[in-house]
Amino acid sequence: YKRQTYNGFLSCVFESFAEKETPAAILPVDEADQTCLFGAKYIETDLRRAERVRVSIPKKMGMEAQDLLERAFFTCMPEKELRMLEFMRLGYKVGRGVCGRLTEPAVDKITKAVQFLEREAHLYLGFLRFAEYGDVLIAQIEPKNSVLPIIAPHFINRFSGEDFMIF
């Protein structure tokens, strides 16, 4: 399967359940074209299908699972989409207690990856320094995870009257 965004990932999840198949990989479009030996199945992002999956997560697994999955998408965990799909399959099977099943490999991997993401984001909140370039405050980061969506609200509130950029 190929995916590009979180909605794209949720579209892949819908397709996996609808077709009763487990993909060998879920990859970004550019990566799938280069690494798939036997070809790839391109899954078009379908917002209606993605929304059906998104709405089903808190209903079946609870808000904690929804938050965990949304944050897991920002991690640098290898094959995160497959791990997320494994987590979701388990969650649909066992229900709201899924996040507490830390002995399950799917839950353990996702939980540890999200903890790593949150620790890294927390470090950037405390140690990120800005430099003035004209009227703009600029900070450069080199995160392992995609922490910017996690830390952005903090800096938007902190610098509400300032022009700033984090890259």
Task: Describe the residue ranges of each PLM region.
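Conserved small/polar residues in nucleotide/adenosyl-binding loops
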Residues: 1-4
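Short N-terminal binding/cap micro-motifs at the start of the first secondary-structure element
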Residues: 6-12, 16
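Extended, well-ordered protein cores
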Residues: 19-167
